[in-house]
Amino acid sequence: MSQFPALEDFDDGLVTAPVDDSKNNTDFLEREKLALGEDAGQFETPEDKDALLNFENDSEAEQTRFEQNFPPIDAEMQASGTFSAPKAPYMGQAEVHPPEDESGDPEPVRKWKEDQMKRIQERDESSKKLRESNIEKARKAIDDFYENFNDKRDKVIAKSRKEQEKLLEENESKSTGTTSWERILKLIDLSDKPEAHGRSTERFRELLISLAKDSNAPGAAGTTVSSSS
């Protein structure tokens, strides 16, 4: 934007030329002196003259600065109808700044963000590897558990089967014999043990032995003995 007012503003009366106030003030003082006549000197002091001179000097200095900044339009107009360049540039040349980073962050902040992102990625990768390792260990532990469980179960089943077969064989061997009394003798304990009340079972053992030896003894063939016999 130009520092000079537009010509249209002068035509519309929006901008007016500066008025020399020093001349008006001087005329006013002269009129006052004429009105007072000879008594005007009584009201005049040296300070009044100094103030008037200072005011005139200030007005002249202000007028000079205005004429330097705003020269007459008719003198500055060129043939092309455009304003000439001002004596003093309105603005200095704009300072050229180097292009900033697209992110708008200073270099230390940008570097810190990059390091932070790198640490986060490394931590995520480490967590992922640890998770996969834990899952693999858990699967292996489950497989080992079922493998050991099945192995132990098979061993227990095999042991139980052997013990069952052994028991059946023992029962079969004990139950074999020519007579029922022989099988009974194999199932009972014939050792000489004292009874709790001091009674001896020797007589009973002798009776069972004699019955086992006699193939014709009652009940030797497994038949029920009647009361009449």
UniProtKB/Swiss-Prot annotation:
Biased composition range(s): Basic and acidic residues: 107-132
Keywords: Coated pit, Cytoplasmic vesicle, Membrane, Phosphoprotein
Region Disordered: start-end pairs: 1-24, 76-132
Gene Ontology BP annotations: clathrin-dependent endocytosis; exocytosis; intracellular protein transport
GO terms under cellular component: actin cortical patch; clathrin coat of coated pit; clathrin coat of trans-Golgi network vesicle; clathrin vesicle coat; cytoplasm; cytoplasmic vesicle; endosome; Golgi apparatus
Cited Pfam families: Clathrin_lg_ch
Recorded topology in the membrane: Peripheral membrane protein
Homology family: Belongs to the clathrin light chain family.
Assembly and interaction partners: Clathrin coats are formed from molecules containing 3 heavy chains and 3 light chains.
Listed name of the protein: Clathrin light chain
Species assigned in the record: Schizosaccharomyces pombe (strain 972 / ATCC 24843)
